[in-house]
Amino acid sequence: MLRLPRFRLVEPTTWTEAATLLREHGAAESDIARGTPSVPVMLVAGGTDLFPNMKRRQFTPQVLVSLGRVKGAREISNGSGLRIAAGATLTEVATHPTVTRKYTALAQAAGAVSTPQLRNMGTIGGNLCLDTRCNWYDQSLFWRTAEGYCMKTHPEVVCRVAPSSPRCLAVASADTVPALIALGAKVTVENASGRRDLDLAELYREDGIRYMAIGRDDVVVSVTLPDATGWRSTYVKLRDRNSFDFPIAGVAAAVRLDGKTVTDARIAVTGVASRPVAVDAKALVGTKLEDDAIAAAADVVHKGSRPMDNTSGTISQRKRAARVFTERALRSLRDA
């Protein structure tokens, strides 16, 4: 049996208090590039990804800052668009009437994460911050010790996937992120110095270790979606087991229509790089989603997908899946 390491749990009641506790316990000074086990303090919401990682000793924080008692952490509120607090569970997001009616891609993505039990615990904020994955990293401590570790936990070791690579190639696998990028979402982040808003795509960088482009003392507070009038969206994914697994490749697409003509379009892909890939979808603008326009957009996705041999599926399978699932997504939007 894999057991959790010892840690101390602190339970703030406000976002500001949570950010302050992170800084007080050394988050700002910590550097995950020194190896994931070196991080002294971490946030926990649902814990559906963090606790298994801790059991495998991928992380061994001395302090966990729980968001479970933060006031308003699970609110979903309508305005000109939609604001979702980071503590809202994936089930709450997937079944919210406004999400299912106006933001279909998000409802589909949130509903495609793992199993119902884990969606009842896992949060939208946790999915945004989901750790990158790799077959060399997501193993027990015993397994990794026998193999000599990898760059993500021990930076002095080469990347086992590509030994000549100067960076970790672990893959981004969150389902909700491409959906939110395709929907034009912004994220609110807070630290001890205050709050700021970012385009969601700015939250990530192409690095399997330091995959978040925010500080270790930053807290994701909420995600805000713009008004979806005139937009259609969808999310589709390929995975080993259709009831449980992370995406081998996942594609979110959103188009704004004037009649049947596309006036704006966004496509984002997960599971094919260390960050979610926002794809240039301008080839769709001005079209009526004819087959040749869809094929052109799918070709852009195919060329921009650069999976490595580090998760389920072969490289060619994942790259082809990105193309095929883009075509499926766009056809479903055309025929809706």
Predicted regions and their residues:
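C-terminal structural segment of proteins
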Residues: M1-A336
